[in-house]
């Protein structure tokens, strides 16, 4: 599946989730005012989600280019790399104002696209993310991803995605 197709699927899912959220949410204001003007809100949310998905996918592809794939066969380095990517997605989601549902969908798609997890593994992994403390070892790995994507997008370090290759080697030899 190409990156473009993945992005279309993510945007479609986001639009449907947001549509259902608006359609099935009881609201006294909506019943008094008649139909709500949810169209622009859905369109805006879908655009933000598409933007995050595109940036996250590009970052994941750039990060995975130099990674030793053999090192990712061990669960430790693979899970650590997934935590790193989760941090990057989290940073992008926060920066663009995505909600939890959209963040979850993008994270699952990016982890699967990067080859770090299967669809089922990515779903379980992303479901566990809210329970991880920022001060835990896992939280620190997520912070590395957040810091790296920030450095990349701010122009501080154009080679920032290559840091993942170095980290994977460190994790594989630890």
Identify the meaning behind each predicted range.
Residues 1-38:
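N-terminal signal-anchor transmembrane alpha helix of single-pass membrane proteins
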Residues 2, 8, 99-103, 171-173:
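Basic/polar, acidic-poor N-terminal "presequence/leader" segments
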Residues 26-74:
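N-terminal topogenic membrane-targeting module
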Residues 39, 43-46, 50, 108, ...:
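Residue-level detector of alpha-helical secondary structure
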Residues 40, 47-54, 75-83, 98-101, ...:
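Alpha-helix boundary/N-cap detector
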Residues 61-95:
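N-terminal interaction modules that seed assembly of large macromolecular complexes
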Residues 103-120:
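Short, mixed-charge aromatic SLiMs
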Residues 121-174:
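Low-complexity intrinsically disordered segments
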């Amino acid at each position: 599946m190409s990156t473009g197709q993945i992005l279309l699927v993510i945007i479609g899912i986001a639009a449907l989730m947001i549509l259902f959220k608006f359609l099935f949410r009881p609201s006294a204001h909506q019943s008094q005012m008649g139909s709500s003007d949810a169209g622009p809100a859905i369109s805006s949310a879908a655009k933000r989600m598409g933007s995050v998905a595109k940036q996250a996918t590009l970052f994941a592809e750039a990060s995975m280019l130099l990674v030793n794939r053999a090192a990712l066969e061990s669960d430790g380095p693979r899970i650590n790399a997934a935590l790193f990517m989760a941090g990057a997605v989290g940073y992008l989601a926060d920066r663009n104002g995505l909600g939890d549902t959209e963040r979850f969908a993008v994270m699952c798609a990016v982890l699967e696209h990067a080859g770090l997890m299967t669809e089922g593994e990515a779903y379980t992994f992303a479901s566990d993310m809210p329970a991880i403390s920022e001060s835990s070892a896992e939280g620190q790995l997520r912070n590395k991803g957040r810091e790296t994507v920030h450095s990349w997008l701010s122009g501080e370090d154009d080679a920032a995605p290559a840091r993942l290759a170095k980290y994977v080697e460190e994790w594989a030899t630890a």
